[in-house]
Amino acid sequence: MRKITTAEALAAQIQDGATIAISGNGGGMVEADHILAAIEARFLQTGHPRDLTLIHSLGIGDRDCKGTNRFAHAEMLKRIIAGHFTWSPKMQALVKNNTIEAYCFPGGVIQALLREIGAGRPGLFTHVG
């Protein structure tokens, strides 16, 4: 069964404390920014969702306001697990000021871990971290 929904309806389903994994190619390419914008808009209007954990393996953003910059609100984001923060200056500021928990792992390790989680396997051992 195929189900099509709006970005706003999708954003409304995200609960406080949720973990969200996003993907893209960095530099504002191949990113579902319309959905990310709807999540941010909901937070700015209602204060929810809050205390999120955000996971991404590649830098996602445009060095301005898109991508992970949309999650760069202290109350919205509790922690980020990422390959790097190059494309998100607002996220860099939260990390630099210890406003949120931040973990930086190799992008390939994050991608492999997400694959293992999606397959229902227990985890991942790697030589690099």
Residue ranges with predicted function:
Residues 1-129:
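Conserved alpha/beta enzyme-core scaffold
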